[in-house]
Amino acid sequence: MTQKPTVTLIYHFFYPDDVVSARHFSDMAEELDKRGWNVNVLTSNRYCRYQHSKIDQRKEILHGIDIRRSYRPGWNQSKNIPRLCNALWLFLNWLFTIFRAKKTDCYIVGSDPQFSQILFPFLRILTGNSTLIYWCFDLYPEAILADARNSLLTLGARLVKPLIWACYRYVDVIIDLGPIMQKRIAAYNHNKISKTLTPWALKEPSVIPLQDINMREQLFGTDVTLGLLYSGNLGLAHEYELFLEIARKLRQLEPGIRFAFAGRGNRFESLKNALSNEDHNIKVAGFASESELEKRLAVADIHLVSLREQWDGVVVPSKFFGSLAVGRPVLYSGSKDSDIGQWVQEYECGMILDRNNVDEVVNTLVHLSKDKQLLEKWQKNAFQVYQDHFSKKKIMDSWDELLRAQKRSEGWIPACRTPKVCDFREPHARE
């Protein structure tokens, strides 16, 4: 009988946390288990968004997946020094755990905590010939350089780049989220295997979902001719100003075109403060439970996605994939040369909004509000683009193939032909 291959996932947050990246790592564990892998997880006992909450169960075997949660102090993640201390605390705990544990064939390290690349030289010493893989969701120190609010931090980020360059030398495979991110990482001249494997949507309906009329009215009001929704995190990397500008132009041209913002993040309060009593075509809503998430995403006709240009290749907004998964094209406020900008143009799954084409976008939205056949055609294309290029099955099949290929020099690991069913998703995950 062929011995099952083994893999360890290392990431700051994991099930039952509801933050999107934790859900992706939880999904990955589940999907690799289905494909015949023995999966171990090293994570923390903390939640991303709920600073004072802890996960009590430190060791857990859930549906065959071995989860080990290292204790982490409740130091404030929103402050720079405590956040770095949290990272170092976890790095030391994880390395000690790996030192004591049986080694696995592969180790997949995510990019949270920040500067997790520092783990790789030590992992190489501890794990020998195991395959070391870096899955980059947020690129550091580039994220600090993109923020640029603190000159001292910016200087520190520049000084640490040579250390990160050295750490990449110990990685075998680097997984990025898009071509621009791959280009940024390639600037380190790492000469390692590079591959783009995007995150998938948390909800993947098999057909384009129908709109719930009651929920649509709750979100956009009555007599809506076109609904545009921003759903998810509104953080430092995102912008909303151009969305407000076109909404205010449309308020007079076509009152039936409505905008809704439903989310959280560093800039969400700024958005709410920017609204006036005259912005009656702009609504603000809270998060939806996972049971309501698919309905929430489907009630919009078009989804809003944004990324500031200095963040191109540093992060890739996951809401892009969630939008396509429910058959909704995107209005993307960002650079046409960014990862999402390139996909929007290549797959014709949305529009790009910038300061030079505001009036053009406004006119297109007015036209779409009246031409439902064109809108439906656009939505069907968005749904098919997701199925063909970004679905969880497609991405995880690529992950499985990649991981098994790394073992060919030691003997081929056959693929699992009869995957078992395993699902430990939490019913309270967020958008």
Short names for language-model regions:
Residues 99, 118, 122-126, 154-174:
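Membrane-proximal helix-turn-helix segments that form the acceptor-binding/catalytic region
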Residues 201, 220-238, 244-247:
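Conserved donor-binding/catalytic core segment of Leloir-type glycosyltransferases
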Residues 268-294:
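Nucleotide-activated donor-binding/catalytic signature segment of Leloir-type glycosyltransferases, i.e.
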